[in-house]
Regions:
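A glycine-rich helix N-cap at a beta->alpha junction
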Residues: 73-90
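Conserved beta-alpha-beta core of the PfkB/ribokinase-like small-molecule kinase fold
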Residues: 128, 133-210, 228-229
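Structural motif
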Residues: 2, 127-128, 188, 220
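Hydrophobic beta-strand scaffold residues
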Residues: 55, 81, 159-160
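Conserved phosphate-binding/catalytic region of the ribokinase-like
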Residues: 3, 150-154, 201, 205-310
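Glycine-rich phosphate/adenosyl-contacting loop at the front of the ribokinase-like
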Residues: 1-60, 65-72, 76, 249
Length: 310
C-alpha cells in the first residue's frame, strides 16, 4: 500500500498531567513535557507507517533546528519526507497543548507556514491521497488543490479528506473554504462532532450526510465521536460502532490516528464495520502513556482486541 499524506506538520509541545507530581506534599509539577513532531499529517503518517504502509509526507517546515530535527526523526520512523519542503529563513510552526488524561487544552500555535500543492505527477504510485486538515490551509481551498483531487480521482487514486476546523469563531467556514468544490472528488470524508456542528450546523449524522450529498459528495462519510466511537454513512445506510474504553494519557492526534487506521482498513477491502472497529482499537491503543513518540500498536495487538468484539 502506498499513501501520500498532505497537510500539517508542526512541532508539538505537550505538557502531560499538570499538577500531578508532589513536592512537599503539594502537587506542583507536571508529569512531563514532551517536544515531538506533530500536526495532523504527521500523526496520520506515523500511524500508517506503523501498520506497514509506504508513506510519503507532503508538508512544509522552516529551516530552523526544530524543522531539521523533526525531519530526522520522521525519516527514522520511517516516513518518506522527500515531498517535505523546507522554507528558507522561516521558523517551524509550534503548537502548545496541555494534556490531562482524556482532556486536551489547546493553548496556542505560532503562525502556520504556507502549504504547497504537489503536482499530480508527484503522486506517482500512490493508491491513497489523504488530505489532513482541509480547512486549516487556505492553499487547499484553491482551484489548484481542487484540480489535484480531481486528477487523483480520475487516475483511480482514493481520496480521503479530514475536514477539521480553523481556530476562528464567527465566520462561515463552510463558505470560505469552498468545501463544496472538492467534495465530488472525495471518497472518504472525516469529521468530528465539533466540525459537524461548526460546518454543517448539525451533529446528526443523517442530516450531515444529506447536506454533503447536496454538495456533490458520493463517498463514505465517517463521523468521529471520540470515545463513543463513530457513525459511518454510505449512501442511505448508517453504521454505528462503539469506541474502546481505555485510560488515556494523551489524546492529541487521536482523530488523525482514527482516520489513518480507518483508511488502512478501507484500502484493505474491509467493510465499514470492520474498518470502524479496527480504527477504534488502534486509536485506543495509541493514546496510552509514552515517552517522546506515541506507542502505536502492532497489528497483532489490534487483532487480539478485535477478536473480543462482537
Amino acid at each position: 500500500m502506498n499513501v501520500v499524506v498532505l497537510g500539517e506538520l508542526c512541532e508539538d509541545i505537550l505538557m502531560h498531567n499538570p499538577n500531578s507530581v508532589e513536592v512537599f506534599e503539594q502537587k506542583i509539577w507536571a508529569k512531563d513535557v514532551t517536544v515531538t513532531a506533530g500536526g495532523s499529517a504527521v500523526y496520520v503518517s506515523q500511524a500508517l507507517s506503523r501498520m506497514g504502509v509506504d508513506v510519503r509526507l507532503c508538508a512544509v517546515v522552516g529551516d530552523d533546528e526544530s524543522g531539521k530535527r523533526m525531519l530526522r526523526d520522521l525519516q527514522a520512523f520511517p516516513v518518506d519526507c522527500s515531498m517535505v519542503r523546507m522554507l528558507p529563513n522561516s521558523d517551524t510552526t509550534r503548537s502548545i497543548v496541555i494534556c490531562d488524561g482524556p482532556e486536551k487544552d489547546f493553548k496556542g500555535c505560532s503562525p502556520m507556514l504556507p502549504l504547497y500543492i504537489p503536482d499530480i505527477e508527484d503522486l506517482g504510485g500512490a493508491e491513497l491521497l489523504y488530505v489532513a486538515g482541509y480547512v486549516l490551509y487556505p492553499e487547499l481551498w484553491t482551484a489548484e488543490a481542487r484540480d489535484l483531487l480531481k486528477k487523483a480521482k480520475e487516475r483511480g487514486i482514493t481520496v480521503a479528506l479530514d475536514v477539521q476546523m480553523f481556530p476562528v469563531e464567527g465566520i462561515d467556514q463552510l463558505e470560505f473554504s469552498h468545501l463544496e468544490g472538492v467534495l465530488p472528488y472525495v471518497d472518504i470524508f472525516f469529521a468530528a462532532r465539533k466540525e459537524m456542528l461548526g460546518l454543517l450546523k448539525t451533529e446528526d449524522p443523517a442530516g450531515c450526510m444529506k447536506l454533503l450529498q447536496e454538495m456533490g459528495f458520493r463517498g463514505t462519510a465517517v463521523f468521529k465521536q471520540g470515545g463513543k466511537g463513530c457513525v459511518v454513512a454510505t449512501g442511505g445506510e448508517l453504521v454505528r460502532r462503539p469506541g474502546c474504553t481505555v485510560e488515556a494519557y494523551d489524546t492529541v492526534g487521536s482523530g488523525d490516528i482514527f482516520g489513518a487506521s480507518y483508511c488502512y482498513g478501507a484500502m484493505s477491502g474491509w467493510d465499514s464495520r470492520r474498518c470502524a472497529d479496527y480504527a477504534a482499537v488502534f486509536t485506543a491503543l495509541s493514546i496510552g502513556e509514552y515517552h517522546d513518540v506515541k506507542n502505536y500498536p502492532a497489528k497483532e495487538a489490534v487483532e487480539a482486541v478485535l477478536s473480543t468484539i462482537d
